[in-house]
C-alpha cells in the first residue's frame, strides 16, 4: 500500500483530500495539532464521509492514522522520510508554520539516501500555493538539502474545489460534504509524473483553472455571504433564496466571465454552464453553510491578489465592467461579526482612520481612481 502524509485533519482534509487518497489506495498519516482528532484517528483507524445529496450515501475511509506535530515532530519527520506523496489543507496563513518540519523531513530523506521522487501539493484556496510553500521550506534547507530538493522534491501547484461547511457531530471524525469536487494539479512541476491519482485532473498550465475556480467559486461564494449578511441571511442557501441577492451574485459572475474569456479564451457557453453549476451548488438544500463561515477573515479576502481586488484590477486594465464587484467590496468592508477578529479589526480601522486610508491599507492598491471608486461604496 502506498503511503501519504497529509497536513490538516480538519473537515476539508478528511472530507475531500482524504477521500481521494483513500480511493487511490493510500495509507494516510494525518498531521495536526488537534489532540482530539488525532486521538480519534489513531483509536478508530477509520472515519465516515456523508455525501450531501438525495439518498445521502456514505463512504468509509480506512487505513488512517494521526500524528500530533506539536507533541511528536520526530514522527512527522519519519513519515515524510518514507512517504510517496505529501498534501496540505490547512489554510494559506498556516503554510509557513509547517515549512520547517517539511524541510527536516526532506533533509531526512537526503540523509537516508531516499531518492524516490516526491511531490508536495498545497491544496489551498490560493494561487501558487505549493510554490509559496516551497519558498518557505527553502529557508530551512541546507545547501545540500536545497540541491536534493531541486532534484527529487516537486511542489506542483494545485486547484481544489469542494464545499465542506462548518459542522458539529457526536462523532468528531464524521464529515458531510457536497457531491461536487475538483482537484487539478499542474504537470510541469511534478517530480513524480508516474504517480497519477484517479479523480484528479492534470494540466500543463494550471493558472487558467486556478483563476477560474478562485474568481468564480471563491468570489461568488464570498459575494453570497457579504450580500447575504447585509440582508440578514444566516446561511448561503437562505441568501440564494432571496431573488435580489441571487441576481446580484449572477451579475458578479457575469463580470468574472468577461475577464476569464478575455484573459484565457474560455468558451462562453462552457463558462456559463460552469457558473450555473456553481449557483446550484450554493443552493444545495442538504448543506447548511453558515454565512459567518464563508464571510470570515474579510481583511484577507480584500487583499490585493485576492478574490475581489485582483479581478477588479484586471477588469479595469481591460476596460471591462466591474461595477457589481465594487458593490460587493463595499459590503465586505461593512461586514461585522463579533466572533470574527478581522471583521472587528476592520471596524476599528474605519472608526480611527479615513475610509480612503483603510482601503489603501487593506487592499494594497495605489490606483487612485480605483481607490476612490471603492470608497464610494463603503
Swiss-Prot record:
One of its GO terms (molecular function) is mannitol-1-phosphate 5-dehydrogenase activity. PROSITE patterns: MANNITOL_DHGENASE. One of its GO terms (cellular component) is cytosol. NAD(+) binds at residues 4-15. GO terms for biological process: mannitol catabolic process. Disulfide bonds: none annotated. Its EC number is 1.1.1.17. InterPro entries: 6-PGluconate_DH-like_C_sf, 6PGD_dom2, Mannitol_1_phos_5_DH, Mannitol_DH, Mannitol_DH_C, Mannitol_DH_CS, Mannitol_DH_N, NAD(P)-bd_dom_sf. It catalyses: D-mannitol 1-phosphate + NAD(+) = beta-D-fructose 6-phosphate + NADH + H(+). The keyword Hydrolase does not apply. Keywords: NAD, Oxidoreductase. Belongs to the mannitol dehydrogenase family. PANTHER family: ALTRONATE OXIDOREDUCTASE-RELATED, MANNITOL-1-PHOSPHATE 5-DEHYDROGENASE. This is Mannitol-1-phosphate 5-dehydrogenase. It comes from Streptococcus pneumoniae (strain JJA).
Amino acid at each position: 500500500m502506498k503511503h501519504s502524509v497529509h497536513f490538516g485533519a480538519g473537515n476539508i482534509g478528511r472530507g475531500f483530500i482524504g477521500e481521494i487518497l483513500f480511493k487511490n489506495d493510500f495509507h494516510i498519516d494525518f498531521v495536526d495539532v488537534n489532540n482530539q482528532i488525532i486521538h480519534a484517528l489513531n483509536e478508530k483507524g477509520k472515519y465516515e464521509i456523508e455525501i450531501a445529496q438525495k439518498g445521502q450515501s456514505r463512504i468509509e475511509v480506512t487505513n488512517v492514522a494521526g500524528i500530533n506535530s506539536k507533541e511528536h515532530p520526530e514522527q512527522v519527520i519519519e513519515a515524510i522520510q518514507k512517504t510517496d506523496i505529501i498534501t496540505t489543507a490547512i489554510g494559506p496563513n498556516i503554510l509557513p508554520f509547517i515549512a520547517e518540519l517539511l524541510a527536516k523531513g526532506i533533509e531526512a530523506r537526503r540523509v537516508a539516501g531516499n531518492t524516490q521522487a516526491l511531490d508536495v501539493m498545497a491544496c489551498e484556496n490560493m494561487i501558487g500555493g505549493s510554490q509559496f510553500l516551497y519558498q518557505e521550506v527553502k529557508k530551512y534547507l541546507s545547501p545540500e538539502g536545497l540541491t536534493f530538493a531541486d532534484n527529487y522534491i516537486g511542489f506542483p501547484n494545485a486547484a481544489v474545489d469542494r464545499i465542506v461547511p462548518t459542522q458539529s457531530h457526536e462523532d468528531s471524525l464524521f464529515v458531510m460534504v457536497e457531491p461536487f469536487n475538483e482537484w487539478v494539479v499542474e504537470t510541469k512541476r511534478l517530480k513524480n509524473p508516474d504517480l497519477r491519482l484517479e479523480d484528479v485532473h492534470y494540466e500543463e498550465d494550471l493558472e487558467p483553472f486556478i483563476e477560474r475556480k478562485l474568481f468564480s467559486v471563491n468570489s461568488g461564494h464570498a459575494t453570497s455571504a457579504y450580500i447575504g449578511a447585509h440582508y440578514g441571511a444566516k446561511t448561503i442557501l437562505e441568501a440564494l433564496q432571496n431573488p435580489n441577492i441571487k441576481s446580484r451574485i449572477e451579475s458578479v459572475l457575469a463580470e468574472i466571465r468577461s475577464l476569464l474569456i478575455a484573459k484565457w479564451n474560455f468558451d462562453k457557453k462552457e463558462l456559463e454552464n460552469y457558473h450555473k453549476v456553481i449557483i446550484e451548488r450554493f443552493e444545495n438544500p442538504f448543506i447548511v453553510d453558515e454565512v459567518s463561515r464563508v464571510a470570515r477573515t474579510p481583511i484577507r479576502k480584500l487583499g490585493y491578489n485576492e478574490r475581489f481586488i485582483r479581478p477588479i484590477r484586471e477588469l479595469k486594465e481591460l476596460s471591462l465592467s466591474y461595477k457589481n464587484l465594487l458593490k460587493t467590496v463595499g459590503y465586505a468592508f461593512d461586514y461585522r461579526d463579533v466572533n470574527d477578529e478581522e471583521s472587528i479589526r476592520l471596524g476599528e480601522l474605519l472608526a480611527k482612520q479615513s475610509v480612503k486610508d483603510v482601503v489603501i491599507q487593506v487592499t494594497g492598491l495605489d490606483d487612485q481612481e480605483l481607490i476612490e471608486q471603492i470608497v464610494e461604496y463603503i
